[in-house]
């Protein structure tokens, strides 16, 4: 099989039949337990799940983090033990030791196989221990490990309050000073008096949340809340009049739940990754809220000017996405805007409805930069991809950890895609972090060639 890079006029979508090569989605515990500060995550699975969490998260159990393993034993699988009693014992212990505001049960492959009725047990146990229990089945049947967060957020949508739950108490007690109440309680009560409420969904570090909130405040748009919030008690109001907008491309299940269960109005916008994406994201929200964007063009130009030292390294370079975390389309669009050529965008799963705005923006970016349209390959076959990489010889391959070393041994510079998941890549100011990750292998190669001359030695031995 030979691979040639055709100059396509429109986006080309292909679907192969490859296996999914990704982390287990229960890895979402790694960042969600830190994001929701008053939560406790209980992963219900086997020893394998425990080993994975222990190694992937890098936290020893002696540190007593706010997550734990409910390890299934032979007695559980053979139905000799009562699942309800065992989970009740563990949850009572969690309540006594940590007293969280919410316990999140993370189902795994094993709970699916043995048909554990977690959704049936949770309400009964919740009423007994008086702590909310959210059930999320973040098992290995998903396409990408980032979809674990999608599953948890979709489950939390049903726990978000509705407007009538807050307005009724306020109407019943007429002597309450609502002005002082708004000042005291903040956005949860303040949003009642707005015609259009905006809720953003997606787990981001608090510093990035603040940055995006400020960008919208500059346009006179107030964010009513975030899903997830830092505290479970601060979950945003979700109702039929609320506008919602996502910040990550892997949250299609959450978006569908928001629209179907709570009748929210989804704002379809490109994702705020890179200066171009952040500007388009803010502009789309402004158009929905009837605001004229102020100073966005100038702000984007300033950011690009500050990135010039990195742009000189990547202009004219080629990149190949093997596919791992569903961020590929957004990252490819940003790198094309930086002057790179993207040969192929491999992606485990593509929700074309949720990513419609991002795909249209990718197409527009390719036209503006006068570069060929990349192929988008859904569910790529890694054997075919390796062959195409061998033929195309890209300057950089963004890949999962499993393929990085074999590609490096064949003279292809690589970057782990998982690093983009944990890095701060959203908003105007974090664009530099994306290019820092992308250019690191390129700068390493320049150093080896320029000062040490090791590249020829390596190539001669391959």
From Swiss-Prot:
Its EC number is 1.3.7.7. The keyword Transcription does not apply. It is found in: Plastid, Chloroplast. Keywords: 4Fe-4S, ATP-binding, Chlorophyll biosynthesis, Chloroplast, Iron, Iron-sulfur, Metal-binding, Nucleotide-binding, Oxidoreductase, Photosynthesis, Plastid. It is an enzyme of class 1 (oxidoreductase). SUPFAM superfamilies: Helical backbone' metal receptor. It catalyses: chlorophyllide a + oxidized 2[4Fe-4S]-[ferredoxin] + 2 ADP + 2 phosphate = protochlorophyllide a + reduced 2[4Fe-4S]-[ferredoxin] + 2 ATP + 2 H2O. Binds 1 [4Fe-4S] cluster per heterodimer. The cluster is bound at the heterodimer interface by residues from both subunits. [4Fe-4S] cluster binds at residues 24, 49, 109. Its main location: plastid. Its cofactor is [4Fe-4S] cluster. GO terms for cellular component: chloroplast. GO terms for molecular function: 4 iron, 4 sulfur cluster binding; ATP binding; metal ion binding; oxidoreductase activity, acting on iron-sulfur proteins as donors; oxidoreductase activity, acting on the CH-CH group of donors, iron-sulfur protein as acceptor. GO terms for biological process: light-independent chlorophyll biosynthetic process; photosynthesis, dark reaction. Pathway: Porphyrin-containing compound metabolism; chlorophyll biosynthesis (light-independent). CDD domains: Pchlide_reductase_N (cd01979). Coiled coil: none annotated. Component of the dark-operative protochlorophyllide reductase (DPOR) that uses Mg-ATP and reduced ferredoxin to reduce ring D of protochlorophyllide (Pchlide) to form chlorophyllide a (Chlide). This reaction is light-independent. The NB-protein (ChlN-ChlB) is the catalytic component of the complex. Belongs to the BchN/ChlN family. Protochlorophyllide reductase is composed of three subunits; ChlL, ChlN and ChlB. Forms a heterotetramer of two ChlB and two ChlN subunits. This is Light-independent protochlorophyllide reductase subunit N. The lineage of its organism: Eukaryota, Viridiplantae, Chlorophyta, core chlorophytes, Chlorophyceae.
């Amino acid at each position: 099989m030979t691979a040639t890079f055709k100059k396509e006029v429109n986006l080309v979508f292909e679907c192969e039949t490859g296996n999914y090569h990704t982390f287990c989605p229960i890895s979402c515990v790694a960042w969600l337990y830190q994001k929701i500060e008053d939560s406790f995550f209980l992963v219900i699975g086997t020893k394998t799940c425990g080993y994975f969490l222990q190694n992937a998260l890098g936290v020893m159990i002696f540190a007593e983090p706010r997550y734990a393993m409910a390890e299934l034993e032979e007695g559980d699988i053979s139905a000799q033990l009562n699942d309800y009693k065992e989970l009740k014992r563990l949850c009572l212990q969690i309540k006594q030791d940590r007293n969280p505001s919410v316990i999140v049960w993370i189902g795994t492959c094993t709970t699916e196989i043995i048909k554990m009725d977690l959704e049936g047990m949770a309400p009964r146990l919740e009423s007994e221990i008086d702590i909310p229990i959210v059930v999320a089945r973040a098992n290995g049947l998903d396409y990408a490990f980032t979809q674990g967060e999608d599953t948890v957020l979709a489950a939390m949508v049903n726990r978000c309050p509705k407007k009538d739950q807050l307005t009724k108490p306020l109407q019943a007690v007429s002597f309450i000073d609502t002005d002082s109440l708004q000042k005291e309680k903040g956005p949860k009560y303040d949003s009642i008096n707005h015609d259009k409420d905006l809720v953003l969904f997606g787990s981001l570090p608090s510093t990035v949340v603040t940055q995006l909130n400020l960008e919208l405040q500059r346009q006179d748009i107030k964010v009513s809340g975030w899903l997830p919030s830092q505290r479970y008690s601060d979950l945003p109001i979700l109702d039929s009049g609320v506008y919602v907008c996502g910040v990550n491309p892997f949250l299609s299940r959450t978006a569908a739940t928001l629209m179907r269960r709570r009748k929210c109005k989804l704002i379809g916008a490109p994702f705020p990754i890179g200066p171009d994406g952040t500007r388009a994201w803010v502009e789309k929200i402004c158009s929905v809220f009837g605001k004229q964007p102020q100073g966005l063009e100038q702000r984007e130009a300033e950011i690009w000017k500050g990135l010039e030292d990195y742009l000189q390294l990547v202009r004219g370079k080629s990149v190949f996405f093997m596919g791992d975390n569903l961020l590929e389309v957004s990252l490819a669009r940003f790198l094309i805007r930086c002057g790179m050529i993207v040969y192929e965008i491999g992606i485990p799963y593509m929700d074309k409805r949720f990513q419609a705005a991002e795909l249209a923006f990718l197409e527009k970016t390719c036209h503006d930069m006068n570069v060929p349209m990349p192929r988008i390959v859904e569910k790529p076959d890694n054997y075919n991809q390796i062959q195409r990489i061998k033929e195309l010889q890209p300057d950089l391959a963004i890949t999962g950890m499993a393929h990085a070393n074999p590609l490096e041994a064949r003279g292809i510079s690589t970057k782990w895609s998982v690093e983009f998941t944990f890095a701060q890549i959203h908003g105007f100011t974090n664009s530099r972090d994306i290019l820092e990750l992308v250019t690191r292998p390129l700068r390493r190669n320049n150093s080896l060639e320029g000062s040490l001359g090791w590249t020829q030695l390596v190539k001669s031995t391959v």
